[in-house]
């Protein structure tokens, strides 16, 4: 009996070792999956980024059904890069990109953020060369920003 209890205890302690670690949040996965199903066309204007983008009703604000929100709250540069394919496949007319502030809150270096934004820009330019890209500045922050943990 003692051996069975020890065996079960050992198995229970080992379970976390086998659990697959998630790369992104459930919210990210839900939004990214939704965006894969929503078509992008060459007439579209895409707002791409994090919660600042996610939190606005862009089509209503501009009264234009071709304006599409592709923001995900909490997103980081590599999150945007990982979900670019359905966007560039549609070869949109314009992309407004605002990303990087959540990388700052996670302690990512400025050089790494610049490198990852450059990867995003290169992919857009290579796969959708006629798309006009509007790169928006990462918002300035002070030392207390880390307390928000975007």
What are these regions (language model features)?
Residues 19-94:
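Serine-esterase "nucleophile elbow" of acetyl-processing enzymes
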């Amino acid at each position: 009996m003692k051996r069975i209890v020890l065996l079960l205890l050992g198995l229970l302690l080992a379970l976390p070792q086998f659990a697959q670690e998630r790369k992104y949040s459930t919210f990210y996965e839900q939004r990214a999956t939704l965006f894969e199903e929503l078509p992008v066309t060459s007439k579209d204007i895409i707002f791409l980024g994090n919660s600042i983008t996610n939190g606005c009703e862009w089509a209503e604000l501009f009264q234009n059904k071709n304006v599409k929100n592709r923001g995900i709250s909490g997103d980081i540069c590599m999150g945007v890069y990982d979900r670019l394919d359905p966007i560039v496949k549609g070869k949109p007319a314009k992309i407004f990109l605002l990303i990087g502030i959540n990388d700052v809150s996670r302690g990512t270096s400025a050089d790494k953020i610049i490198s990852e934004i450059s990867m995003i820009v290169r992919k857009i330019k290579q796969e959708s060369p006629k798309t006009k890209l509007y790169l928006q500045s990462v918002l300035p922050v002070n030392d207390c920003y880390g307390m928000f943990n975007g």
